[in-house]
């Protein structure tokens, strides 16, 4: 039984029912319906912290999904899982792949910036001030692009950019 059919959460059940109705009335292929079911099950597993199960569902959704825009969200969610697991290098790979398919994905840009900022902080702790500045500049570039796409979001990033004098071009 698919995960989406065994949800105990009211909101998840409601989403599942609505999604199932939409899948029945929208003119989509069986392959697209299967891809969406795996994606939905991946999101459900991810929300419950079942990352291995979520990844299995996302990989299956990727195998079936042909639309680049839809694939971008699957890749983004895979990146989120790797970020949560502390696998920042792998997360970056998936965020970059998501952006290749959907350049207007500010959340992926933000998450890339967060990783570069984190690495910059680590470089400071390791006494690598030159490397930290390079990483902070990369973070600033990605945050600026995320803010350009979503000007009312990422307030903390906007404040950091102002405080560090990196807010030029906003």
Curated annotation (Swiss-Prot):
Keywords: Chloroplast, Membrane, Photosynthesis, Plastid, Repeat, Thylakoid, TPR repeat
Subcellular location: Plastid, Chloroplast thylakoid membrane
Biological process according to GO: photosynthesis
Pfam families, per database record: TPR_1
Stated name of the protein: Photosystem I assembly protein Ycf3
Primary location recorded for the protein, binned into one broad class: plastid
Entries under SMART domains matching the protein: TPR
Membrane topology, record value: Peripheral membrane protein
Job description of the protein: Essential for the assembly of the photosystem I (PSI) complex. May act as a chaperone-like factor to guide the assembly of the PSI subunits.
Domain of life, per lineage: Eukaryota
Family membership noted in the UniProt record: Belongs to the Ycf3 family.
Record's signal peptide: none
Keyword NAD: no
Name of the gene encoding the protein in the UniProt record: ycf3
TPR repeats: 35-68, 72-105, 120-153
InterPro entries found in the cross-reference section: PSI_Ycf3_assembly (IPR022818), TPR-like_helical_dom_sf (IPR011990), TPR_rpt (IPR019734)
Cellular component GO terms held in the UniProt record: chloroplast thylakoid membrane
């Amino acid at each position: 039984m698919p995960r989406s059919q065994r949800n105990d959460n009211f909101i998840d059940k409601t989403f599942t029912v609505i999604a199932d109705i939409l899948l029945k009335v929208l003119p989509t292929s069986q392959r697209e319906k299967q891809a969406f079911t795996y994606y939905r099950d991946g999101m459900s597993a991810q929300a419950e912290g079942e990352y291995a199960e979520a990844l299995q569902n996302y990989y299956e959704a990727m195998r079936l999904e042909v639309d680049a825009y839809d694939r971008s969200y699957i890749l983004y969610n895979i990146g989120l899982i790797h970020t949560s697991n502390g696998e920042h290098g792998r997360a970056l790979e998936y965020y970059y792949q998501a952006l290749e398919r959907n350049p207007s994905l500010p959340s992926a840009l933000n998450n890339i910036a967060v990783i570069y900022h984190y690495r910059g902080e680590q470089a400071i702790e390791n006494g690598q001030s030159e490397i930290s500045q390079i990483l902070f500049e990369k973070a600033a570039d990605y945050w600026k692009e995320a803010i350009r796409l979503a000007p009312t979001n990422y307030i903390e990033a906007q404040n950091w950019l102002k405080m560090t004098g990196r807010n030029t071009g906003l």
